[in-house]
Amino acid sequence: MPNLEIIFSSDECDIFYNTNLHIVQTFWKGVYVNDEPFRRILDEIINALELKKASIIIADAREMYVISPNDQEWILNSWYPRAVKAGFRYQGLILNKDTFSELAVKTISNQYDSSTVTTQYFNSPSDALEWVKEIQEAGAEK
């Protein structure tokens, strides 16, 4: 059973530190958010990476709404570089069944330099956490 330490909570998203796996986990709650409130949440993810010295994020985005084009651009040009500087190297994305949301998330991830951040897509949290264990067993997470 994972031991999740709450790092940040809002109406839109919860951010946890998984003390068993030494990863940051996010759970989007199905409340539409964009612009500054959305960016503040993503900045809290960077804070969690820095605080816990983690390199892996598992984002449960099944309840996430479409990301606006302005926010997509901000993620690519501002958030990703700062997250990488904070130690971000791997992301597992548990995707929404909404085709538009899935497309937006994959578009952003595929545009960022894959030599810096490794991305995998999953249908379930258990599959994503198994992937984390494989990375850690291979000694690749640092």
Q: What are these model-derived regions, one by one?
A:
Residues M1-K142:
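Amphipathic, Lys/Arg-enriched alpha-helical "gate/interface" segment within cytosolic domains
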